[in-house]
Amino acid sequence: FATARARPYLRSVSDASGGGGHYYCDISPRFRWREEWDGQKLRAIFTRTLPAFMPLGGDGLQRITDVQVSRTTRSGRVAELRIVFERGDVRIPAADVRAVLRPEADRPLASTAFQLTATKDGGEVSRLVAAGAGSGHGVGMCQWGAVGRARAGQDYRRILSTYFPGTTLERLY
């Protein structure tokens, strides 16, 4: 998030409850998730999403030889995705990763907090698995975490000060 530098309260905040491996946001249906694509499905997704980033040429999409996370942020989110073809590669910036690895045409990937495992057959990616956590961009208030914190007895002041450190609440009316 480019604005995080200008606004120090916009940053990733841990939702760990402080003990026993429990997280306030673990009630989310997307707390831990997994997407899996076979080679044919991956090819169909990239044929649909990659033209915005690279020309496919008259022959269509080349053989996909690797898909990898090439850079991560300090919090472990994907900062750049690299897709390797027989003759070249394309690098997808963090802001576009969820749209390029779109599981369905109308649904982006849940978040950039994921790890990839590529299985190859004959030098070509035959299966790609993304194992991830959460949903969204990872900055600001986690909606599910706020619900979990409220259920644990935290009031709105404490919840907001946790997600937006250094801010103050003021009555405007």
Regions found by a protein language model. Name each.
Residues F1-Y173:
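Conserved, single-site charged/polar hotspot
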